[in-house]
């Protein structure tokens, strides 16, 4: 895409309702973690990817995701995590997509469609 798009993936959820002993975003679905699925869907659309991780799990997220993303410590609430991630995005980005790692099966086609609508001036 020609425009500068950033994507925030909220992954700081604890996963308590899932009964997992690790953050929800690190739970595996088929062959990859939820956050890996989310990153792979958004990577073709966004030039900057920021993932929020629960405090104490940042290194595990970095090991799973590698250098293609920026991992930051999330906040107590989802809104805190998004605010912290927004503060990391340089001013020259035109669009910011906000996605939840737990919604890991959203497609690249959907993300491209959202950006295309934003470019046209639509709200998304």
Question: Model regions: which residues?
Answer:
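Short, active-site-adjacent cap segments at secondary-structure transitions
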Residues: 17, 57-59, 103-105
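Conserved N-terminal catalytic core of the sugar/cofactor nucleotidyltransferase
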Residues: 35-94
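Conserved short-loop catalytic and cofactor-binding motifs
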Residues: 23, 73, 98-102
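Conserved beta-loop-beta/alpha segment of the NTase-like Rossmann-fold superfamily
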Residues: 78-124
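N-terminal glycine-rich phosphate-binding loop and ensuing alpha1 helix
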Residues: 2-56
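Short amphipathic alpha-helical segments
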Residues: 20-23, 40, 62-64, 109-111
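Conserved beta-strand scaffold positions in the cores of enzyme catalytic domains, especially
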Residues: 26, 71, 123-124
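Residue-level preference for short coil/turn positions at secondary-structure junctions
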Residues: 1-3, 22, 30, 67, ...
């Amino acid at each position: 895409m020609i425009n500068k798009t950033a994507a925030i993936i909220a992954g700081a959820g604890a996963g308590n309702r899932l009964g997992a002993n690790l953050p929800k975003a690190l739970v595996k679905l088929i062959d990859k973690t939820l956050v890996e699925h989310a990153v792979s869907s958004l990577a073709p659309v966004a030039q900057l990817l920021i993932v929020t991780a629960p405090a104490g799990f940042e290194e595990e997220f970095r090991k799973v995701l590698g250098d293609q993303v920026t991992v930051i410590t999330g906040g107590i609430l989802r809104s805190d995590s998004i605010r912290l991630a927004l503060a990391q995005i340089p001013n020259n980005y035109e669009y910011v997509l906000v996605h939840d790692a737990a919604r890991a099966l959203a497609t690249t086609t959907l993300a491209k469609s959202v950006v295309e609508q934003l470019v046209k001036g639509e709200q998304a």
